[in-house]
Amino acid sequence: MRDTLSDLEAGKQLSDENPIIRAQKLMQAQLPKRFYEQVEVAEVEGGFAVHLDGRPVKTPARSLLMLPTASAAEIVAEEFRAQEKVIDPGKMPATRLVNTAIDGIAQDPQAVLEDILRFAGTDLLCYRADAPQELVSRQTARWDPLIDWAETLGARFTLAEGVMHVEQSREAITAFGIHLSAFTDPIALASLHTMTTLTGSAIIALAIAKGEVSAEDGWTLAHIDEDWTTEQWGEDAEAAARRKARAVEMMIAARVIKAL
């Protein structure tokens, strides 16, 4: 039996410097047929693997797909059980996240940590509307508590109105980075990076990871501007569909990091 997901490999060359892009390129190819009946989580040396008919799942780069906890591995197992005629990575966000972590982030975790910190330097929560007053008030009421929370971590962020760039202090980014660096597991970093890029806010991502806010509340906080615009002008169907798809990715990332 071939290695699971080997048909998803896009090529042997991993020339991309970005470890996330490098890992994701391995997962872009013709979809393999579902060839298994039973999906189980099995304890192995160093963690927990997902077995298909008794054989361990491997990543596109042929590494063992292993997670540190049984509950995290079960999230991936659920996705394999849900596959029907083919194995479709597009419907397997947790599996993609773990593959990215193992094949990419584990090789260069510092690059991913630095990318999250770059988001912190231009965090969504730091850029406020100057009008209309209703939106200004909504942002203040909903975003300020997380800005205050970040300050309790030693990260004092500077706010700005409009689109003018504001430089965050080295002290704020350093303090924020100390708390991010506590998440050393590549899968945790993958989850944090996913939540950060989907929301545009490293503060929201860290707050979810630390249990300060729920994933659902964090997602709502990230869309205050969008929701206000929808209230004024109505919903765009295509934008709503894209948001719904991103929300699935967001909730899975939050669920995985909580299960580690």
Locations of regions flagged by a protein language model:
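Hydrophobic/aromatic-lined pockets within catalytic cores
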Residues: 81, 146, 151, 207-213
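Alpha-helix initiation and N-capping motif
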Residues: 70-73, 95, 109, 113, ...
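An internal, amphipathic alpha-helical element
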Residues: 166-239, 252
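An N-terminal structural lobe/cap that precedes and organizes the functional/catalytic core
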Residues: 3-107
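Conserved aromatic-histidine-acidic binding/catalytic patches
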Residues: 64, 131-134, 138, 187, ...
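Internal, conserved structured core segments that host functional sites
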Residues: 110-175
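Extended, aromatic/histidine-rich regions of cofactor-dependent oxidoreductases associated
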Residues: 2-35, 39, 214-260
